[in-house]
Amino acid sequence: MKVSLPAFEKARVLVVGDVMLDRYWVGPTGRISPEAPVPVVKINQVEDRPGGAANVALNIATLGGQVQLAGLVGQDDTAHALTLGVQTLGVEPQWLTIADKPTITKLRVLSRNQQLIRLDFEEAFDKADSVRLLKQSEALLDSVDVVVLSDYAKGAIDQPRDFIALARAKGVMVLVDPKGSDFGRYQGASLITPNMSEFEAVVGTVTSEADLLEKARGLLKQHHFDAILVTRSEKGMTLVTTNAPELHIPTVAREVYDVTGAGDTVISALATSLAAGADLPQACAIANTAAGVVVGKLGTSTVSRIELIEALALHHGESGFGVVSEDQLAYALEQAKLRGERVVMTNGCFDILHAGHVSYLKQAKALGDRLIVAVNDDASVKRLKGDGRPVNQVDRRMAVLAGLASVDWVVPFSEDTPQRIITRLLPNLLVKGGDYKLEDIAGGAEVIAAGGQVQVLGFEDGISTTAIIQNIMANQ
């Protein structure tokens, strides 16, 4: 399957569920306690990370999506720490504070990358608290495209069927990370994502692939789900829908250090991808890749867009580079600059790619870390070059350019000049081939005003698209 990332910044997601704080005490251990046969850990690091539904929201925000988070918290310092943790990445918390209950906290003691013990601080919330939370969340449905219900069976999501029905009536997809043996609580959901243990807790032991598919289809029919994605650890994922053949996606995890939060990563990547316009098989492939990244980290963690791009390049032959939309490129360029990479940009028709082009693009790439090539679409080439041009359609021209080792991104534009797209992207260095004066280069003034540079490179003499066309015509 060819996998490419959608424009995650367009995703608008609401996460409702059991929020918690994952607290880590970390330090070395070198002796056994004289009081009991247990290791003594000398704590030298304390770290708080949002967990549960809050980790789902952070994953969405890290990918670039817009996310609101609704959950139950206590009136305590832990709630304050949780609020700070999610706001750091731009998540909008919509808490319902329950004064007589603590904010759920999971304290883990780690040494040498191994978890020694976990201590839970929590009390079950009342059913009335869940009713109030879901009612409060209804007001947020008009501002989102996808809702995630992140259920850890702590009381935030007790009976969500009416909430699901209302969301679906408004055209909002509802994804559920389920818990417990009664999937009927989530009736009408767009998609549920049980792991294999959760799935078998509802349908019984799965004896074969055919048995899994039969039982999954039974759940679809019984509870009016549109789809079920069963996550299966080392066996990957299986997607079963009401209107298409099943889809098996093999795991891409190379090393597994910690499965904490892997389910959160799956549903967050699904939600962000679907809200950004990806179809369901694409979203599942992206989620599977994201899960493969996060299990290679220790503790509750998120996956960045850049990590996802690199993993897709490794496992799918798709890097998030190559031919991209303008929106995708704007995001990728922002991330490249954050990594300290120097981005070079050039433009042209590149109708018949020749040795002069290849040499020029190689020179341009040598001036930085990344090279963008903006390509005139077919209509603009015809306006600039006349009838009979372009010889090659824009998708073919871009595909050839994307195949060059020197080129990182190829993006089309429809205007006669690249002024608008250059002004939007503002590379570190804008280059142009030929005998241009710097002041005549489209977008040059804007790049310089933003702190960038403009440079003119020479073309190889005697090589041009026009000359090639004339030579072909003369030899017919």
Swiss-Prot record:
Pfam families xref list: CTP_transf_like (PF01467), PfkB (PF00294)
Gene3D superfamilies referenced in this protein's UniProt entry, alphabetically: 3.40.1190.20, HUPs
Pathway: Nucleotide-sugar biosynthesis; ADP-L-glycero-beta-D-manno-heptose biosynthesis; ADP-L-glycero-beta-D-manno-heptose from D-glycero-beta-D-manno-heptose 7-phosphate: step 1/4; Nucleotide-sugar biosynthesis; ADP-L-glycero-beta-D-manno-heptose biosynthesis; ADP-L-glycero-beta-D-manno-heptose from D-glycero-beta-D-manno-heptose 7-phosphate: step 3/4
Active site: 264
Cross-referenced CDD domains: RfaE_like (cd01172)
Classification via PROSITE patterns: PFKB_KINASES_1 (PS00583), PFKB_KINASES_2 (PS00584)
Positions of disulphide bridges: none
Region (Ribokinase): 1-319
Keyword ATP-binding: yes
InterPro entries attached to this UniProt entry: Bifunc_HldE, Carboh/pur_kinase_PfkB_CS, Cyt_trans-like, PfkB_dom, RfaE_dom_I, RfaE_dom_II, Ribokinase-like, Rossmann-like_a/b/a_fold
Gene Ontology MF terms in the entry: ATP binding; heptose 7-phosphate kinase activity; heptose-1-phosphate adenylyltransferase activity; phosphotransferase activity, alcohol group as acceptor
Quaternary structure and partners: Homodimer.
Identification of the protein by name: Bifunctional protein HldE
Organism of origin: Shewanella baltica (strain OS155 / ATCC BAA-1091)
